[in-house]
Amino acid sequence: MAISCAVGMEMQEPKMNGTLSAGAAAGYRQEREGFLPTTRNPATGRKPVQFLDFEGKTSFGMSVFNLSNAIMGSGILGLAYAMAHTGVIFFLALLLCIALLSSYSIHLLLTCASVVGIRAYEQLGQRAFGPAGKVVVAIIICLHNVGAMSSYLFIIKSELPLVIGTFLHMDPEGDWFLKGNLLIILVSLLIILPLALMKHLGYLGYTSSLSLTCMLFFLISVIYKKFQIGCDVSHNDTVVEAEQAPLQAFNSSCEAELFTVDSQMSYTVPIMAFAFVCHPEVLPIYTELCRPTQRRMQAVANMSIGAMFIMYGLTATFGYLTFYSTVKAEMLEMYTQEDMLILCVRLAVLLAVTLTVPVVLFPIRRALQQLLFPSKAFSWLRHVAIALILLILVNILVICVPTIRDIFGFIGSTSAPSLIFILPSVFYLRIVPTEVEPLFSWPKIQALCFGVLGVLFMAISLGFMFANWATGQSRMSGH
């Protein structure tokens, strides 16, 4: 999951949908290799100014790192839970499918950007459907960012009491000042709000790179703890306490399920989709790429998605093989409070998510200002009020939601399929001219099927999730 840019760059004068001259169509075909055609004005002999006439400075390797960091987010903590409810083989197959589909959707975005020279996700919405399209895309991105903020604050809610309790040698369940709900309010007021009130991100924007480093540390620790805890969990002191996860609930034979389907599967695929959302960041990274071509940026995307697939697969597999069917949606909760290695992991993750929340809040506020107050000058009162209202709403959400799985599941069933499946396919169908790709050509049929798949995925996931909530199975699952 990544930090989504909810504010677009200034776009060029839009061309009419579905129409291109013969020369422009030829330019589009050349654009399979170059980002924008380099035609010249016959009157002046000068090349027309395009937004990418400046040379990008970011290397290929750094672009891979940036996009990998955009993909990486809190969703990695829920992947072992997803594997527990699908089985090892089925999970890895689903994860591979989500990765491949994410790569294809990025291909659709890059192709659309190549046609019209736009470098922001919501500007593609305006190009395809006018101002209403831009508003819809901005709302979806804001929803996804609110979900990301909620997941980060939920991690603070569950992990900070354990960290403070360890240092103070206190029971986080027994002392009122170690309650998670109180702590997230204090962290929001004392740390997140002051950072969110800054007028510009400045160096705070670089703190998002902490997430990738912290999650690598998390992965290494999960692998190490698997071999330390071993199989005989009933005699191991490093697992969670009995009241957190009853020992009899562990798989006594330590046999992993290779393929399984249960009522909680309605959460598993959305968790995987949530973990791969990076699409609003693709076009800005494309803009900054040195020698930007569609093929080169697609290679950046493929390498980033491939690296995250490996990292996600390892984390889920070793986490599941440590705790089997008892693993929780937030895997760090499974480890004991006194484990010093896990304490270091908790501190690293807490630092990363705390500093990332204001970074996520910035584009939401900017998008709201552009949508609600497009012609208004900067106002500190409005700047502070939007940040405060957003933090209050997210805190209420985190306090009321019982598990982080519900956040992963809902966002992974709504904004994630919209950003990965539905919007890229709709953009492709609307933006790519019929002179280049006829309506019934194979690429457009593929894009149409891709969008339909996203709609079905959203409908089925939400249907099963609401059914679980209505019947109480969500609470009875024990996680």
From Swiss-Prot:
Gene Ontology CC: plasma membrane
Primary location recorded for the protein, binned into one broad class: membrane
Residues bearing carbohydrate: 236
Free-text tissue specificity from the UniProt record: Expressed in the ganglion cell layer and the nerve fiber layer (at protein level). Also expreseed in the cells of the inner nuclear layer and in the inner plexiform layer (at protein level). Expressed in Mueller and ganglion retinal cell.
Record-marked site positions (Involved in pH-sensing to the transport activity regulation): 471
Location of the protein in the cell: Cell membrane
Entry's Gene Ontology molecular function annotations: alanine transmembrane transporter activity; glycine transmembrane transporter activity; L-asparagine transmembrane transporter activity; L-glutamine, sodium:proton antiporter activity; L-histidine transmembrane transporter activity; L-serine transmembrane transporter activity; neutral amino acid, sodium:proton antiporter activity
Name of the protein in its database record: Sodium-coupled neutral amino acid transporter 5
UniProt source species: Mus musculus
